[in-house]
């Protein structure tokens, strides 16, 4: 099953500026973890914002789980796209406990099922003992795990991660990368990881795509990762 399909996507911050993303096409299958590499300003983070519905393209089509979410005459709101996001700063609510941070994204789930889902997510990221803690009481790696649990809790079709390791020191980054790959594959989660660090994609991704001046891609310029 194709989980994300993008055709001829073009985006500019204004009509007077050159496109940040120009005629970009791409597809990925369910369960794949894809890395997006590129220099600053190449449109990596903008691509995630377009997929999630936080930006509107000039032209092009995006499908998520075979549902069209944007094209010339259609725009599905972000909350109805089945997309989960983990941001660079994790965006946890400081006044909420770990449990309440995860519960926040489950408002559409029947109340009787919410506690079970929180418990499942805490077990998945191995943070069961931190359920009553607040974000400021957690390390950077622990905060990232909770951000991941919150993003996965509503069962999104696709998870988007924007520079998820940039706030971690080198030693912690290496261990967290390994943990993240295990968690994503255990959850059979399709994921796009934006990063400037090739080591990130080599550690967890099935293949990578480099965004550059033309921002055009096809199957021939994907680089598939080799995992032990």
Segments (PLM) and residue ranges:
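A short, proline-enriched helix->beta-strand linker immediately N-terminal to the Walker B motif
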Residues: 153-157
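ABC ATPase NBD coupling module
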Residues: 69-84, 108-111
